[in-house]
Amino acid sequence: MGLVTKVIRYLGLLLWWLLLPQAIASVESDNLEGIRSETVGGDIQPERPKSFQRVTRLDSSIRSDMRYASDQNFVGRPIAGYLAPVCYLANPAALALVEVHQELLAQGYGLIVFDCYRPERATNDFVQWALTREAAQKTHYFPRTDKSELFAKGYIARHSGHSRGATVDVGLYRLQFDPAAASGKASNGVCRHRFAQDRAAGLLDFGSEYDCFDRLSQTAHADLSEVAKQNRQRLVKAMAAKGFVNYDQEWWHFTFQPEPYPTVYFDFPITED
């Protein structure tokens, strides 16, 4: 083999070695986009439209505990796209949620939001996490569910209605309560790690914690205390009166109908402004 031939072969191998990481990254990106195109079936918009409202600016008495902006969630870390603990919703859904809250205030209760608009990148973050073996939060969030079943049982999906801006996760708090007098024990040991903390904060007992990947989270589940059943019924009734439809596998999950953006999935990050 001549010297020139050896040099050409060497340069070819060097070029291949330099370009390999880019090729792999391109394939991974194409695969991710393939998942988006296949499962979303709608437009993905990277910017926040002016028609999205910051809910707590419409009514500051709506409480907020945006878990995905912290490590207090089933992944155990802040989720991609959640740069601030802020609740955004498309305008019709935001205004309707305020109406729900105001109706509840007259009954001695108020809304607390756990998740509102969710960037598409956050859903992708959930998907990537679900495909790993990491399960540090299993005891708290899915003690009776194998992680490999999270897709099949509908707890995690490759796209989310939250990204369309009209779906919200909520609970209720009591307007008048004495934190020092808050007591009691959970009626079961499944997804109850925040029981004492939530009662001390005035949150109502719904029989399972938010984001509990378990059959106990089914809205009409029978194996609940009467108090938890009544609280779920109160929440569903109040939300339904203003156009929110409950997802029957999760007592906290509601979608405003008709959706303002039924075929659009947004991906702008959640920031203070």
Each PLM stretch: what is its role?
Residues 5, 21-25:
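N-terminal cationic amphipathic segment used for targeting or macromolecule association
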Residues 2-12:
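Bacterial N-terminal signal peptides that target proteins for export
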Residues 10-21:
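Bacterial N-terminal signal peptides
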